[in-house]
Amino acid sequence: MKAKVIVGMSGGVDSSVAAWLLKEQGYQVEGLFMKNWEQDDHNDYCPAAKDLADAQAVCNQLRIPLHTVNFSKEYWDRVFAYFLSEYEKGRTPNPDVLCNKEIKFNAFLNHALTLGADYIATGHYAKNTIEGSIGYLFKAKDREKDQTYFLHAVEPEALSKTIFPIGDFTKPQIREFAKQLGLVTHAKKDSTGICFIGEKRFKTFLNEFILAKPGEIKSTGGKTLGQHDGLMFYTLGQRQGLGIGGLQNSTDEPWYVVDKDIASNTLYVAQGSQHPMLYSQGLICGPIHWLADYENHLPLTCFAKTRYRQTDQACMISPPDNNQHYVMFSSPQRAITPGQFIVFYEKNQCLGGATIEQIIR
């Protein structure tokens, strides 16, 4: 009997096809649906209920059992509390990275092992290789959909217990498989945005948990231009929603957020999408979570992304200084955002990543 694999079934097309591919390869396949968020249950439309129904329908079609588990407490403690604390500091976190690290490749993995799994699998667009108890992470065939940026914080030991069945396929191929199989998820839209917010407006959602502190919007020259609703609602490079268009004798170019001064609660803006204040030559990041043995090879020249779907940018990582690293880029980078992640690559391999702490102009 081939190994037992438990697939994280989200109710989407990617995990549906992942389960089918594993079954075709002869694995003993079971599904598991994770509920990670309780807040939506009072709504008329609950996405979690629809996703569970779709996951169950797919498992019925594939004739595999579906387990369910509630990780809402773990999610709140390990992901959402961090998400809120970062926004309270005026930073812009990425909860998907932490959700993968703490929930999908930790809580889910441990739960699956108690159910007798040899491996877990997910519908992520990524690839890995396994050497003993260590897994190495590589980009998916579909570069447009590659999700290694969100997986860089997963432990190498967890990657050694993981299979990524769809990593060698493109999204159109996955949809075509699902359509040919008649899976109920074949035409389901990809989920977008932060999983626990769903269709809510982001501002409305944050207001439920954090007290907003309005303050001044100023030009880079120090001129007061208006009022902001709270620094947490704005991110570097943002253009929409500033409410200061068409001001006194200014050029017609739009305004962009270029800085946030937490101490004075001031939002700084400048005109023009190419304004120098939007660009940084480098950044300071926290400790690097390494997925490959490069820790003792610093300084290191490699490539990096400071946001999802950015093309790889040439950079140099310095040796650690006080548990931080300086990363300098070959060309200036636009709208690098503290609280987000920088993820490092060498060709197709994901080397690891770190939290962006400061920008270096």
From Swiss-Prot:
Q: In the UniProt entry, which residues are flagged as the active site?
A: 99 (nucleophile), 195 (cysteine persulfide intermediate)
Q: Which Pfam families match?
A: tRNA_Me_trans (PF03054), tRNA_Me_trans_C (PF20258), tRNA_Me_trans_M (PF20259)
| Gene Ontology terms describing biological process | tRNA wobble position uridine thiolation
Can you list the disulfide-bonded cysteine pairs?
A: 99-195
Its localization reads: Cytoplasm
Reaction(s) catalysed by this chain, per the record, are: S-sulfanyl-L-cysteinyl-[protein] + uridine(34) in tRNA + AH2 + ATP = 2-thiouridine(34) in tRNA + L-cysteinyl-[protein] + A + AMP + diphosphate + H(+)
**Which residue numbers mark the site Interaction with tRNA?**
124, 340
Q: What is its EC number?
A: 2.8.1.13
List the residue ranges of the region (Interaction with target base in tRNA). Answer: 94-96
List, alphabetically, the GO terms of the cellular component aspect.
Answer: cytoplasm
> What's one GO MF term for it?
ATP binding
Q: Where is this region: Interaction with tRNA?
A: 145-147, 307-308
* Positions that bind ATP: 8-15, 34, 123
Q: What class of enzyme is it?
A: transferase
- Which keywords does the record carry? ATP-binding, Cytoplasm, Disulfide bond, Nucleotide-binding, RNA-binding, Transferase, tRNA processing, tRNA-binding
Which SUPFAM superfamilies does UniProt cross-reference here? Adenine nucleotide alpha hydrolases-like
Describe the family membership recorded for this protein in Swiss-Prot or TrEMBL.
Belongs to the MnmA/TRMU family.
User: What is the documented function of this protein?
Assistant: Catalyzes the 2-thiolation of uridine at the wobble position (U34) of tRNA, leading to the formation of s(2)U34.
Task: Please name the HAMAP family in this protein's record.
Answer: tRNA_thiouridyl_MnmA
Q: What is this protein called?
A: tRNA-specific 2-thiouridylase MnmA
